[in-house]
């Protein structure tokens, strides 16, 4: 079941080649008219253009024989009455005083804005729905496909962990917990965007014009701000997941601001816990190649533990702590070993990345403790898990991910990042912090020490392993 949230509006959409003197026809833009409604212009491939047009008058069905109360009350729109001619007729009125004609129509349709959210996203953690089955809204801001893919991405990695026997079924309950809130946020945004898009524009100083009735129109500056915010929302970068077994916000404090909104732990003052981790440039310690951190965390179902030990060359205590981590993480009962099947690649469930703040030439690669540069069944070293987070690249580019994340180069920090790139936890860089990471995983992961995979054949050339799925293999 789904609940209607807001009043429906009627829109027409048409893909065609425009013939017009409107100067912004090849720019994505919104056109507000004083009396004739609104229109959105979206340039497409080649010379095609899509117009979303607010329709003022559309015939409705009588609703007889319908079991739907809304249809009985006022009837659904009669889609057969929405034609290219009726859509363009309205567009011409909206775009005045510019001229508009069309040719090469490739597609058109009409729709009602029905803003709804399903009452539940699953049944007994056995049947799940996502995307349009969960939430419907206007298509104008581009959020539909993006939010739907984020639904399935959120659900997908959790199903993979459960189906592979790596995690408890409890994590499936967090799908509705996390995504239903996003759906309601989506509807609230869509309602505001649709209201601003559909309303009459505010006429500056209208109250001073004799006989004017337009003083209460849409503020176009506000519309632009919502438009920009919509891009962030549609991309998923501001989806904020609340505290649960998969998100631990202990130590994080809420903060509001145009560019900083969320729950932040002072150990990583610019990293909102529960949101997607922002990426920045780092330098590979072994090869000094400049790379985005996100490119080293592909979407393959694995968790990442990002250790920021600070400047381990300048602060010897930080270096000593990093070496103490080795005894903990190399032990048979460490969270790395407990939750990775026997004979699987060492980092195939939880991958540890070390991002220090020292100059690359101050520390040799093989001086780092073993857990940071593990070897596989053939003795091959994993070179791509140690990075320099501060310094200069060969081309002179300044690198400082510590500044980007708000991490002190003496205090350091540890971040746990989920397979969907959302930050699950921020803790101090210490043995106590490492224990908190262990407790986080013990809340939902299943012990794999009795899950023995077949031994790998050392005689086979397995270079394809870099292209194959990496989760628990």
Language model segments and positions:
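Short, small-residue-biased leader/transition segments that mark boundaries at the very start
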Residues: 2-6
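Active-site substrate-recognition segment that forms the wall
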Residues: 10, 14, 26-69, 122-125, ...
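Conserved FAD/dinucleotide-binding core of flavoprotein oxidoreductases
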Residues: 34-113, 161-164
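Helical substrate-recognition/capping region of FAD-dependent monooxygenase/halogenase enzymes
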Residues: 69-75, 89, 93, 161-473
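A glycine-rich dinucleotide-binding beta-alpha-beta segment and adjacent secondary-structure elements
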Residues: 97-118, 370-371, 377-388
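Short FAD-binding loop at a beta-strand-to-alpha-helix junction that anchors the flavin cofactor
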Residues: 122-139
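Catalytic cores of eukaryotic secretory-pathway lumenal/extracellular enzymes that build
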Residues: 137-149, 153, 172, 182-187
């Amino acid at each position: 079941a789904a609940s209607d949230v807001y009043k429906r509006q009627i829109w027409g959409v048409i893909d065609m080649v425009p013939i017009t003197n409107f100067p912004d026809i090849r720019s994505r833009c919104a056109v507000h008219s004083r009396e004739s409604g609104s229109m959105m212009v979206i340039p497409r491939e080649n010379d095609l253009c899509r117009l979303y047009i607010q329709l003022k008058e559309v015939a409705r069905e009588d609703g007889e024989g319908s079991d739907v109360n809304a249809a009985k009350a006022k009837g659904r729109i009669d889609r057969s009455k929405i034609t290219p001619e009726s859509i363009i007729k309205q567009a011409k009125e909206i775009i005045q005083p510019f001229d508009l004609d069309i040719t090469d129509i490739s597609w058109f349709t009409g729709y009602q804005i029905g803003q709804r959210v399903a009452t539940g996203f699953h049944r007994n953690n056995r049947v799940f729905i996502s995307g349009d089955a969960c939430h419907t809204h206007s298509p104008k801001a581009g959020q539909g496909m993006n939010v739907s893919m984020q639904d399935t991405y959120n659900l997908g990695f959790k199903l993979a962990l459960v189906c592979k026997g790596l995690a408890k079924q409890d994590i499936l309950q967090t799908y509705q917990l996390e995504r239903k809130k996003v759906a309601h946020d989506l509807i609230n945004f869509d309602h505001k965007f649709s209201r601003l898009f559909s309303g009459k524009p505010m006429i500056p100083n209208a109250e001073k014009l004799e006989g004017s009735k337009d003083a209460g129109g849409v503020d176009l500056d506000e519309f632009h701000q919502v438009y920009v915010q919509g891009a962030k929302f549609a991309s998923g970068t501001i989806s904020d997941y609340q505290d649960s077994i998969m998100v631990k916000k202990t130590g994080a404090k809420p903060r509001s601001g145009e560019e900083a909104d969320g729950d932040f732990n002072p150990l990583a003052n610019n990293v909102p816990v529960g949101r997607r981790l922002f990426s920045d440039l780092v330098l590979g310690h072994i090869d000094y190649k400049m790379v985005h951190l996100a490119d080293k965390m592909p979407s393959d179902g694995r968790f990442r533990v990002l250790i920021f030990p600070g400047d381990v060359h300048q602060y010897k205590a930080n270096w000593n702590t990093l070496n103490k981590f080795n005894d903990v993480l190399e032990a048979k009962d460490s969270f790395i070993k407990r939750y990775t099947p026997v004979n699987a690649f060492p980092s195939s469930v939880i991958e540890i990345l070390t991002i220090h703040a020292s100059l690359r030439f101050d520390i040799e690669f093989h001086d780092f403790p073993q857990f940071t540069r593990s070897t596989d069944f053939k003795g091959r070293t994993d070179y791509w898990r140690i990075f320099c987070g501060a310094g200069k690249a060969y081309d002179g580019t300044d690198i400082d991910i510590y500044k980007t994340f708000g991490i002190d180069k003496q205090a350091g920090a540890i971040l746990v990042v989920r397979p969907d790139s959302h930050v699950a936890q921020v803790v101090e860089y210490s043995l106590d912090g490492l224990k908190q990471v262990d407790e986080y995983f013990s809340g939902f992961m299943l012990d794999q020490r009795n899950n023995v995979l077949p031994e790998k054949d050392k005689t086979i050339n397995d270079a394809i392993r870099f292209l194959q799925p990496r989760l628990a293999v």
